[in-house]
Amino acid sequence: MQKFPPLSLYVHIPWCVQKCPYCDFNSHAQKGTIPEQEYVQHLIADLEADLEKYQASIQHRSLHSMFIGGGTPSLFSAESIKLLLAEIQRRIPFSENIEITMEANPGTVEAERFKGYVDAGVTRISMGIQSFNDDKLQRLGRIHNAEEATSAVSLAKVSGLKSFNLDLMHGLPNQTLEEALDDLRQAIELAPPHLSWYQLTIEPNTMFAYRPPTLPDDDELWDIFEQGHQLLTEAGYQQYETSAYAKPGFQCQHNLNYWRFGDYLAIGCGAHGKLTFPDGDILRFSKTKHPKGYLRGEYL
């Protein structure tokens, strides 16, 4: 009998306030009101179609983890997220200690919703801080400032979350070694259980690709990584993926499932999935990228 790997679920919410110049994810700048209730209904219909189509792979399995990414999922209300999670659980069982991560902006409006997301069932928030330098944040097209980022972390700590992550970038336009390390020191000072510390890369078809900024050279990048890695290690963080650092016991289970070649369902615009079948065959699939098509019920 085929032994199945753990099963996860990725949920994609594609809207954001504005497209960042480095972003190559499937995200769409918000224009008017986001149809969040309608989109949630389509997410559930998408899941139902997959559960029926891939029954041979999915039946008798429970969800090990879930990741709600974007875009900016925290543009959705806590009520919508609660409905989404409840409807998913009605259709596929959750494991006893399921990890449910949701990406969020550290802007004031989104951060105030953290407690509501926890009440909805979210166990882990991943915040896109990127930098604590206001000039660098502006250059990256981020809509929050350093003060809002720090405030959001304080709110996360008292929201009832089991864990939270801070996304931080280095190798930013015109960034010096000391600026990069200062960002990292400020992040460490806030004592998140998990830090994702990754280098800015220029991806095709982004604004930065069309108008490339001046970035640190390879020698400077190596110095940033070497000294930054030492800071993180000395602060008790363990590197367990290329850009992921965690305090012991706080590794992201969803990302580990990707790294360990686990299975994952995928719903939402542009979401990618991978499933193992009883005969050992492996299927990879992706969903319709644009919200217009997806909201017409064209999921594949």
Residue ranges and their predicted role:
Residues 14-27:
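Local cysteine-cluster metal-coordination motifs and their immediate loop/turn environment
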Residues 4-6, 27-56, 61-300:
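C-terminal scaffold of the Radical SAM
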Residues 9-12:
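Short active-site neighborhood of thiol/selenol oxidoreductases, capturing the structured segment around
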